[in-house]
Amino acid sequence: MKLSEVQDNMQKTIESTQRSFNTIRTGRANSALLDRVMVDYYGTETPLKSLANITTPDATTIAIQPYDRGSMGQIEKAIQLSDIGLTPNNDGQMIRLNIPPLTTERRKELVKLAGKLAEEGKVAIRNIRRDAIDSVRKQEKNHELSEDESRNLQDEIQKVTDEYTAKIDELLAAKEKDISTV
């Protein structure tokens, strides 16, 4: 396994962790909150974002304008059944979601959730490191690499791992700050 492959895999993990963070509700409206909402559209589970135009007209409102007005009921039902904790307001033209301010208790829960997601990202990075180091040791055992080359590669892999773990910590700190800001 090449160092560039290790870096690519770790970068994908960082991006995945960032996407997970984006689905955590803060006090501000963010259309990413609806990324995981699936709508039963004529018997098919369809992502909400492919059925409607989603905008954030202000900091506390998400507006959902369905391309097909006949799907408003299903969209409303899907939002109610989702775990985002918001109640849709349907005015016949569009669906609005008002984002209430977060309570202190809810902020603490969200910080814990962000920490859990960050830890999952770190575990994924450590698994990538383990696989890469196993690959290097196997190459050394098969005499494809010298002992020194193997040790140097393992040190490089560890440096990259530390770098990407620090990036996840930075993302977590930024998300915690975002959640805690009133």
UniProtKB/Swiss-Prot annotation:
Keywords assigned: Cytoplasm, Protein biosynthesis
InterPro entries: Ribosome_recyc_fac, Ribosome_recyc_fac_dom, RRF_sf
Gene Ontology MF terms: ribosomal large subunit binding
A biological process term (GO) from this entry: translational termination
Subcellular localization, as worded in the UniProt entry: Cytoplasm
Pfam families per record: RRF
GO CC term (a single one): cytoplasm
Primary localization: cytoplasm
Family to which this protein belongs: Belongs to the RRF family.
Its biological purpose: Responsible for the release of ribosomes from messenger RNA at the termination of protein biosynthesis. May increase the efficiency of translation by recycling ribosomes from one round of translation to another.
Entries under HAMAP family matching the protein: RRF
Name recorded for this polypeptide: Ribosome-recycling factor
Organism: Gloeothece citriformis (strain PCC 7424) (Cyanothece sp. (strain PCC 7424))
Chain's gene name: frr
